[in-house]
């Protein structure tokens, strides 16, 4: 299972990557999540400008087997949606790269410290 060391993780299998500006982050679902969901056929995200609290639902992922909610790993505002996700299978193919979901302005960048690092997430998923 692919668990990049430069990301932070949630118990709900979202990842977050703080970008170089220190205030903006990319958010997506983990490789573990996409493999458990199976073939992803549709991604629905809240619109740009939506203000989210930590753990607030920011969208859903529809797979052949199920529909799953997406939870914001940190509080912030959605700045951009990943237009590539019109081809939802991108999430299965590249969950940490082209398959990111939203770009957020993070309300408090230090809140990422409360999320799991790669080692803790790997342990949680039994890796």
Swiss-Prot record:
Lipoyl-binding domain residues: 24-105
Record PTM N6-lipoyllysine, positions in chain: 65
One GO BP: glycine decarboxylation via glycine cleavage system
Organism superkingdom: Bacteria
Described purpose of this protein according to its UniProt entry: The glycine cleavage system catalyzes the degradation of glycine. The H protein shuttles the methylamine group of glycine from the P protein to the T protein.
Family note: Belongs to the GcvH family.
Entry-linked NCBIfam families: gcvH, PRK01202.1
Protein name: Glycine cleavage system H protein
Organism: Chlorobium phaeovibrioides (strain DSM 265 / 1930) (Prosthecochloris vibrioformis (strain DSM 265))
Gene from which the chain derives: gcvH
């Amino acid at each position: 299972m692919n668990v990049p060391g430069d990301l932070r993780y949630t118990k709900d299998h979202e990842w977050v990557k703080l970008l170089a500006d220190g205030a903006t982050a990319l958010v997506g679902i983990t490789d573990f999540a996409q493999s458990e969901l199976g073939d992803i056929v549709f991604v629905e995200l809240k619109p740009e400008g939506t203000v989210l609290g930590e753990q607030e639902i920011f969208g859903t992922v529809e797979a052949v087997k199920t529909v799953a909610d997406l939870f914001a790993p940190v509080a912030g505002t959605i700045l951009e949606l990943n237009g590539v996700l019109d081809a939802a299978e991108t999430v299965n193919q590249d969950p940490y790269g082209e398959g990111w979901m939203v770009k957020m302005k993070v309300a408090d960048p230090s809140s990422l410290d409360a999320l799991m690092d790669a080692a803790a997430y790997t342990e949680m998923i039994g890796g």
